[in-house]
From Swiss-Prot:
One of its GO terms (biological process) is positive regulation of DNA-templated transcription. Residues 51-65 are annotated as: Leucine-zipper. Residues 1-11 have a biased composition (Polar residues). Transmembrane segments: none annotated. This is bZIP transcription factor 53. Pfam families: bZIP_1 (PF00170). The keyword Nucleus applies. Forms heterodimers with other bZIP proteins such as BZIP1, BZIP9, BZIP10, BZIP25 and BZIP63. BZIP heterodimers form complexes with ABI3 that enhance G-box element-binding to increase the expression of seed maturation (MAT) genes. One of its GO terms (cellular component) is nucleus. The gene is BZIP53. It comes from Arabidopsis thaliana (Mouse-ear cress). Residues 23-86 form the bZIP domain. A motif (Nuclear localization signal) lies at residues 26-33. Disruption phenotype: Reduced seed maturation (MAT) genes expression. Slight reduction in the dark-induced activation of POX1/PRODH1 transcript accumulation. Keywords: Activator, DNA-binding, Nucleus, Seed storage protein, Storage protein, Stress response, Transcription, Transcription regulation.
Length: 146
């Protein structure tokens, strides 16, 4: 609407007061725009700094988590190895028990005396089956050193 007023009042074009007011408005608008641009740059700079800090924190967290996963993997491999050793020992002991039981059966046949020969427990024949129902084990998180 300001441009319409400028066209409708031809005497204002030559009026130095009008030119001064217009120049003053342009100067104020230019200063305001500069200040707004400066604030915008400051906001962007702060956002960039915040994002850089967040990236640093996330990288640190990622490194810690990776370290924990590696440690847990090592412990898992160690436990798996121990478990395999225990399974092999259980199998060997089961075989030895069978062998001893067969010797006892031969002694029983030869001597004619009845011997109390224990049967091999089901849990020894099928080690993946628990001999008794599973009961919850209470343990604290500190116990695992994760």
């Amino acid at each position: 609407m300001g441009s319409l007023q400028m066209q409708t009042s031809p005497e204002s074009d030559n009026d130095p007061r009008y030119a001064t007011v217009t120049d003053e408005r342009k100067r104020k608008r230019m200063i305001s725009n500069r200040e707004s641009a400066r604030r915008s740059r400051m906001r962007k700079q702060k956002q960039l700094g915040d994002l850089i800090n967040e990236v640093t924190l996330l990288k640190n967290d990622n490194a810690k988590i990776t370290e924990q996963v590696d440690e847990a993997s090592k412990k898992y491999i160690e436990m798996e190895s121990k478990n395999n050793v225990l399974r092999a020992q259980a199998s060997e002991l089961t075989d030895r028990l069978r062998s001893l039981n067969s010797v006892l059966e031969m002694v029983e046949e030869i001597s004619g005396q009845a011997l109390d020969i224990p049967e091999i427990p089901e849990s020894m024949q099928n080690p993946w089956q628990m001999p008794c129902p599973m009961q919850p084990i209470r343990a604290s998180a500190d116990m695992f050193d994760c």
